[in-house]
């Protein structure tokens, strides 16, 4: 199943608002100039930008990624445990700024946009206990967050997906959930319903040798198209991490193949670079313009 602009979830990372000197606070107000929401744009480790969440949204990203550790009862956002700081949390960087933006934009992440921002939450600490804390946090934003009840989705402005140390059994057992499960390519034929596993993500280098130098081998191109077709047939979206991300012809070549295959989310740390590439080369964005 191919997701349309209407149904595409966004992954979001926000700005720190408390004590972290290296992280600028996110602005609740929408940007002054119109920004085109980019269906495929995913901000990898979004919290590492100067203005978490805000920078991604200023470049039209519809999916952002936050690494989360449960420390002293807080859902702290950082790549490594030693970098966690009190008050720099999922709520302060993402949920609160997104709720403010939701209110400022009349119920949408981007004014006039009817899609859902995907917030990819990568659990770094113990899966079950951290997920329980995430679940509690998401439930505090019922008007903002997508939920699933008895297998039926009620889409809202932000859709959370759990990656990293994912407690599948605990998530599957919930009658009402406020997050989806991020699967792996080994889950493509698992039979897990798309309402539980809306996304399948994996490491590019574990499945492909091509990194953009020369033409893509035909066997690998066929493999990529088959993966995406299989995922879409089950209603799953597709994302790869560890794709080339240094500006240059190799990155452009890989991004071109990802678009041609219908990969749903393109992973990057270069917000401006991916924005410019998608606006110039993604047929979806050209149709929307």
Q: Can you describe what each PLM-predicted range is?
A:
Residues 32-38, 55-62, 69-289:
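Catalytic cores of phosphodiester-bond hydrolases, prominently lipid phosphodiesterases
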């Amino acid at each position: 199943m191919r997701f349309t602009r209407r149904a595409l979830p966004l992954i979001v990372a926000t700005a720190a608002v408390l004590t972290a000197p290296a992280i600028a606070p996110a602005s609740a107000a929408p940007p002054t100039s119109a920004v085109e929401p980019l269906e495929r744009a995913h901000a990898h480790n979004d919290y590492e930008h100067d203005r978490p969440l805000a920078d991604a949204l200023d470049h039209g990203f519809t999916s952002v990624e936050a690494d989360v550790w449960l420390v002293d009862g807080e859902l702290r956002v950082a790549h490594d445990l030693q970098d966690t700081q009190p008050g720099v949390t999922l709520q302060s960087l993402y949920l609160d700024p997104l709720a403010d933006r939701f209110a400022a934009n009349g119920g949408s992440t981007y004014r006039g946009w009817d899609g859902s921002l995907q917030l990819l939450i990568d659990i770094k600490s113990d899966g079950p206990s951290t997920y329980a804390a995430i679940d509690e946090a998401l439930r505090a934003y019922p008007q903002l967050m997508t939920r699933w009840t008895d297998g039926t989705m009620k889409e809202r402005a932000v859709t959370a997906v759990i990656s990293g140390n994912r407690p599948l059994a605990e998530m599957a057992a919930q009658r009402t959930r406020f997050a989806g499960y991020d699967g792996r390519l080994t889950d493509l034929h698992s039979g897990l319903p798309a309402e539980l596993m809306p996304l399948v993500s994996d490491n590019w280098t574990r499945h492909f040798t091509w990194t953009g130098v020369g033409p893509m081998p035909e066997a690998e191109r066929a493999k990529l198209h088959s993966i995406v077709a299989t995922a879409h047939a089950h209603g799953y979206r597709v994302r790869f991490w560890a794709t080339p991300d240094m500006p240059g012809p190799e990155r452009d070549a890989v991004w071109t193949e990802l678009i041609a295959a219908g990969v749903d989310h393109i992973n990057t740390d270069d917000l401006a670079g991916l924005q410019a590439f998608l606006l110039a080369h993604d047929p979806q964005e050209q149709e929307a313009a």
